[in-house]
Amino acid sequence: MTGKLRFEVNDNQGCFIFPETWFGSLLDEFEELIDAYDADEISETSYINKLRRLARQENDFIDVHAHLAYVFLEQNAPRKALNAALKGLAVGNRLIPEGFSGRIIWIHPDNRPFLRALYAAILANAHLRRHQDAIMLIEKILDYNPEDNHGARWLLGPELLRTGAHEQARHILQ
């Protein structure tokens, strides 16, 4: 196995493959950091700084970017959240073959960071009132993961209304 994040396609289903080198210290440190933050053992500032350090250490670690995006959303800093989410999405999109129209489903744990980053980008765009961008990303996440583990479909109707697409929104909301 290579030391780089990969994306494989089988039967029109895509799956990210974490490198073996990530298992152990890097993932352990990341999980311990999340646990410490969730337990209020470290400050938000410390959490952000440590996530940024991990991102510098391994830029392809999509989940670090996704978690940064979510903490910025919690701080009501949607522009920072969008930038963090887009960094994670750029990593994943770079690996997804051009023209890929298959699924990237939640059931595969290695796909979850990409889907989390995608959902964070949706939320950030909605907060920034970039409704067309939010709609495009909602449609993309629903194409990739029709099970919609994040509940993105519930944002589609309101975002369509905000763009003036009333008929389309009515159809979605019924």
Specify the residue positions occupied by each region the protein language model found.
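N-terminal alpha-helical interaction modules that lie
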Residues: 1-104, 112, 118-121, 125-147
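Canonical tetratricopeptide repeat
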Residues: 65, 118, 152-153, 160
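Long, repeat-rich segments with strong aromatic
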Residues: 154-163, 167-174
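Short, structured loop/turn "capping" segments at alpha-beta junctions
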Residues: 132-135, 148-151, 166-170
